[in-house]
């Protein structure tokens, strides 16, 4: 996953992001067609495909952090997207039946999966910033633990931010990236198995199917500047928009 192993004829950033969008859509359609922890083979297959999304998202947060000209603008865009996506996520999760409690954290009686993965991605971006601060290791650790707490209610919880930190902090060491991500995802799998569903917990290990795809990353954003200008707003708009549409379908079908 490091820049030192770029594939000369691989996939550009836009292509990988489109794959992530496709996998995410398949996953969310599965939640709509097969509510709960369905053991239907098609549901399991669709959810397995969906596990490709989060690692690709995490990886490109680290790329965005590395290449951005303005961290503040990048963080603000993610923050605004996280706010919009929260309501789309709740609307989708509750089949269009949401009330005023949508504005209250943990109002639905659960700590996990209370808001979208965008909040977790923002937390990961902030962890990368903390890691580069000129302060003591103790201060960095305290700030990172605080961000873990803040991102706990998000989809993928604090695991996605910690994976982002691991990838960004080991940019030239793909072995370390993989080891740390395996460690954090294993923790997530254990918690999922113990608190939610064993089979769906084990299903989270399918995130590592994304590794061969990320190894094909050629280090470029896209094939043309004109297409890049179209793709950037698309990537930001698609997440909340598709959740809202699926929420409408769940509400009326």
Which residues are covered by each model-predicted region?
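Alpha-helical transmembrane segments and their immediate juxtamembrane cytosolic regions
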Residues: 1-253
């Amino acid at each position: 996953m490091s820049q030192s192993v770029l594939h000369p004829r691989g996939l550009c950033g836009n292509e990988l992001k489109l794959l992530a969008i496709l996998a995410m859509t398949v996953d969310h359609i599965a939640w709509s067609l097969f509510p709960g922890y369905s053991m239907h083979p098609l549901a399991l297959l669709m959810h397995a495909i969906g596990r490709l999304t989060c690692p690709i998202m995490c990886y490109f947060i680290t790329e965005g952090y590395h290449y951005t000209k303005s961290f503040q603008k990048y963080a603000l865009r993610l923050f605004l997207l996280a706010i919009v996506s929260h309501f789309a996520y709740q609307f989708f999760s509750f089949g269009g039946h949401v009330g005023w409690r949508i504005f209250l954290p943990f109002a639905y009686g659960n700590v996990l999966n209370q808001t979208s993965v965008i909040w977790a991605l923002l937390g990961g971006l902030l962890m990368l910033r903390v890691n580069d601060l000129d302060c003591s290791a103790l201060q960095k650790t305290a700030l990172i633990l605080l961000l873990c707490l803040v991102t706990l209610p998000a989809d993928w919880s604090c695991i996605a931010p910690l994976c982002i930190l691991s990838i960004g902090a080991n940019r030239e060491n793909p072995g370390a990236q993989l080891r740390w991500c395996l460690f954090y995802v294993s923790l997530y799998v254990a918690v999922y198995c113990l608190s939610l569903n064993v089979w769906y917990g084990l299903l989270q290990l399918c995130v590592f199917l994304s590794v061969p795809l990320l190894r094909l990353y050629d280090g470029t954003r896209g094939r043309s500047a004109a297409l890049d200008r179209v793709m950037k707003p698309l990537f930001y708009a698609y997440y909340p928009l598709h959740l809202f549409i699926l929420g409408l379908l769940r509400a009326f079908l």
